[in-house]
Amino acid sequence: LSKKNLGYGAANNKIIRKSKTPYVFILSPDVILKKNCEKNLLKSADKLNDFSIISPISQYKDYDLLKSSISETEEVQGFAMLISKKKILRVGMFDEKIFLYAEETDLCRRLKLANEKIYINKNAKVTHLAAKSTNIGFEFDKCRNWHWMWSQVYFSKKYSNNFYVYFKFIILLLIQFIKIIFYITLFNKKEIINKTMRFSGTLNSLLGRSSWYRPKHNFD
């Protein structure tokens, strides 16, 4: 659909716009579907009728504590989601200002503010390999560190009191700077770079700059 690396949110929005079905199944490349996962998700979609997102469960959380096979929740993880196209369009889809991280958290927040319903189906299961959908090593680590902090600041500014957010992240900037100095004294190049990327992502987001950083890798 695109030769350009659009980012998670913008790429999904493009697919949602082009889709001709009432539901769209968003799935990350590092996810393995368990038996009957799609079937169980579609069954719950037909049963519920009124939903914005239904998510399968992954291996990382103890969902056996859930009393019902289908339970309402505040938010889900974005690596596997069956979405209602109509509901997602109503709240403006994914925020394309976010390139990586917190996209689904932001979407779920807007859906809940619009009184939409989000569910998990513990009979629909996946295995999430976590960050193995890319194989670019240290470049991805740099990108991950930069965008993790950029997105955390952006999300906080979007939904919280700005004075508190700026105070909190200015303190964090100072801590990050101290860590950079610390790793310089240890000649630890990897940690110097990682902490510098976090510092840069935090600072750029605080200053209102876009999520511009991209790894030096050809995704085409």
Residue positions per predicted region:
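Glycine-rich, basic loop-to-helix element that forms the pyrophosphate-binding segment
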Residues: 1-19
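Hydrophobic/aromatic residue at the end of a short beta strand that borders the catalytic acidic motif
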Residues: 8, 27, 32-37, 83, ...
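Short aromatic/hydrophobic "clamp" motif used to bind/position activated sugar donors
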Residues: 24
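A short, conserved alpha-helix in the catalytic core of glycosyltransferases
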Residues: 76, 80-92, 97-127
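Conserved donor NDP-sugar-binding/catalytic core segment of glycosyltransferases
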Residues: 31-66
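Non-catalytic, C-terminal membrane-associated alpha-helical segments of glycosyltransferases
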Residues: 143-151, 162-220
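Acidic donor-diphosphate engagement hotspot in glycosyltransferases and nucleotidyltransferases
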Residues: 11-12, 36-38, 103
